[in-house]
Amino acid sequence: INDSIGSIYSALVESGADVYCFSCYIWNIEIILKAAELIKKAMPNIVIIFGGPESGYNSDELLKKYNFIDTIIRGEGEIIIGKVLELIQQGKRPNRFYQGECVDLNSLKFPYTTLDIENLKNKILYFETSRGCPFRCAYCLSSADSNGIRYFPMEYVKKGFKFFFDKKVPLVKLIDRTFNCDSKRAVEIVNYIIENSTATKVHFEIEASILTDELISVLNSAPKDMFQIEVGVQTINHEALTAVNRNYDLEKIRYNIRRLTEPKNIHIHLDL
């Protein structure tokens, strides 16, 4: 998002790809639409595929409004994207819309290679240890996910972190909706990071009202600046919380955040 549309366009055109796939989020959808339109004008025969929450739940409107979008995939794309690419490779045009399948997380491979790390040197890398969210906040697209909360195997998670540590990746951001929804699991992961990371910082989001004493204690013992924690309180207005299905204990949140901040070893970002 910090790159200019010109530099993004140039990089995409220079790659000379036949298919361009874009993951669309609230923070990048506008620039993706501009870039996709430009490269389609420059290379009319390419196939442009959109995925991600900002396209999946708004697919009908996007397909009607932007004719440079060839296909939209809603939901989890690991399985369906392979099928779509096979169709394209066979010289067939894919459908304009596909519904992704709920993926068995045990079947997924680690998404990064050594070459990726070299190409993404000094960049933030994203990693997930779980999918889904146990909460149903009215304003969040995660509330529309009916697949529930699912976890990647712990062996997969630890191998992933070891890869990041060995490559000295500066910052890994977890994209888990609520990292601490399973506190025992969160404690095991945090302990592994503390015991093995030498240069890598880890960022994750938590629900502060369900923080356990054990997880707070482990986080308080971490080396300074190893962890960055994001806490989405959103509002302290009780009526507003009720209206959006966030009936959380604000006093509990306040109490737990104070305990987390006491050692001054963790950077905490609290959203209001």
Describe the role of every protein-language-model region.
Residues 93-97, 201-202, 268-270:
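Acidic/polar loop patches that form or flank catalytic/metal-binding clefts of enzymes
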Residues 53-62, 87-88, 232-243, 266-272:
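Short flexible/disordered coil segments
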Residues 110-262, 266:
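Radical SAM [4Fe-4S] cluster-binding motif and immediate context
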Residues 1, 18, 254, 262-264, ...:
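Short, intrinsically disordered, charge-balanced linker/junction segments flanking boundaries
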Residues 22-24, 176-177, 206, 272:
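Short glycine-centered, acidic/aromatic-flanked micro-motifs in structured strand/loop junctions
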